From Swiss-Prot:
PANTHER family: N-ACETYLMANNOSAMINE-6-PHOSPHATE 2-EPIMERASE-RELATED. This is Putative N-acetylmannosamine-6-phosphate 2-epimerase. Keywords: Carbohydrate metabolism, Isomerase. Pfam families: NanE.
């Protein structure tokens, strides 16, 4: 059974939750052993996969979890706005660290390495390739280039203003166009995640609402302050 077939089976049985285990940078939780513990807890709670950033985090998580890992490396580049897995060496390192799926930025922006070359390198390692996209055009272009999975990860993050709500219409449009879609980005409640499935998502990635304690505390603090004013 292929990894996609196994994921199809697990998603049908469990509902399709993917947990992104990416603490706030510099947080007390931003340690490989804690990231790995989050990943294991997510697996034990029914997540069908986890998303992990960074080689050290991935290596430790790989030693603990059996569910597929979506691996990424984030970089801040002077010459490009692309942050997610921008280099071929990043793909190689993620493959060696134990990723099952490697995600790249799939947007049509200036970049050091083409999307086509990155996808080909992922497939060279016999791994699944995921493209984090911001629009229907991005998603369809990446699908034509061979991406196995299209994520809505970048919707709202390539423009000056980021909306509060997730981009459900993008999920539907990509699904209707024949893409295997992972809904990702601002799915901060179970209700929104369920909506994504109804809009055609294959699975839903949730990060901040599960693994970023500072964000969650901030939401509660803001609500309590408003209630008290």
């Amino acid at each position: 059974m292929s990894l996609l077939e196994q994921l199809d089976k697990n998603i049908a049985a469990s509902g399709g939750l993917i947990v992104s285990c990416q603490p706030v940078p510099g947080s007390p939780l931003d340690k490989p052993e804690i990231v790995a513990a989050m990943a294991l807890a997510a697996e034990q709670a029914g997540a069908v996969a986890v998303r992990i950033e960074g080689i050290d985090n991935l290596r430790v998580a790989r030693s603990l979890v059996s569910v597929p890992i979506i691996g990424i490396i984030k970089r801040d580049l002077d010459e490009s706005p692309v942050r997610i897995t921008p280099f071929l060496d990043d793909v190689d390192a993620l493959a060696q660290a134990g990723a099952n799926i490697i995600a790249i930025d799939g947007t049509a922006r200036q970049r050091p390495v083409t999307v086509e070359a990155l996808l080909a390198r992922i497939h060279h390692h016999h791994l699944l390739a995921m493209a984090d996209c911001s629009s229907v055009d991005d998603g369809l272009a990446c699908q034509r280039l061979g991406a196995d999975i299209i994520g809505t990860t970048m919707s709202g993050y390539t423009t000056p203003d980021t909306p509060e709500e997730p981009d459900l219409p993008l999920v539907k449009a990509l699904h209707d166009a024949g893409c295997r879609v992972i809904a990702e980005g601002r799915y901060n409640s179970p209700e929104l995640a369920a909506k994504a499935i109804r809009y055609g998502a294959w699975a839903v990635t949730v990060g901040s609402a599960i693994t970023r304690l500072e964000y969650i505390c901030g939401w509660y603090n803001d609500a309590l302050k408003k209630a008290a004013s």
